[in-house]
Amino acid sequence: MRGKSINLFLMDGEAGGRIKCTLANWTGIAYKIPRTELDRCKEREDLKQSGVYFLFGTSDTTGKGVVYIGQAGARKNGEGILNRLQEHKRNPEKDYWTEAIVFTTSNNSFGPTEISYLENRFCNLALKANRYEVKNGNDPTPGNITEEKECELEEFIDYAKVIMGTLGHKLFEPITKPVEVKTEVEEKQADDIGKLYLKRTIKTIGTVEAVGMQTAEGFVVLAGSHISPSDDDTISEDI
């Protein structure tokens, strides 16, 4: 993948405030807006347009990251994305979110068809990555688009993926990525690289087996592993 030039504008002069994000040779615009700073965005004309948005927070029960993905169309009264975010802020059923990420365009080119398609694709990509709990109750409809428009929107999605990660949310990236291989021998060799295996027999429990690997985000225990349900006093306190 070629390098990309991303411009991050700290609208409040600090990393924890509002951020406007643009990319060279791209008509899209992204905003990262803390929930507490929504009222300071009332004068931004591009937030009165159509677009898609993501509400990020943390589950009180599981501690896992949660996200709600939605769309907002521009209205005749001049209200669009920001008005929809304000509605969510007032909704007690959506009090879990702490910040929003918004995607729109510099030329106000999104219509109902475009935002419906983007909402559907973003939702399915997030579900596939399984990194966040997706709070959408229903699967958004993709709408009917031409193949030319689909190609155009898929390019927009590719840029949006890069920006989403840059703004701190790897929503579309699975924790462990599949390894591309060509033969069965290469597949086994590639599959074993970097993995650590544990197999141990505990008298009161039986055999426990686990497989893990080091990733760029830390050590990950892979699916299918088994662990002891209770602490083992033979393990050093340092561990």
Annotated model-derived regions:
Residues 38-40, 87, 204-206:
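Sparse, context-dependent recognition of short Cys/His-centered cofactor- or disulfide-binding micro-motifs
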Residues 73-125, 228, 235:
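Conserved short loop/helix modules at catalytic or binding sites
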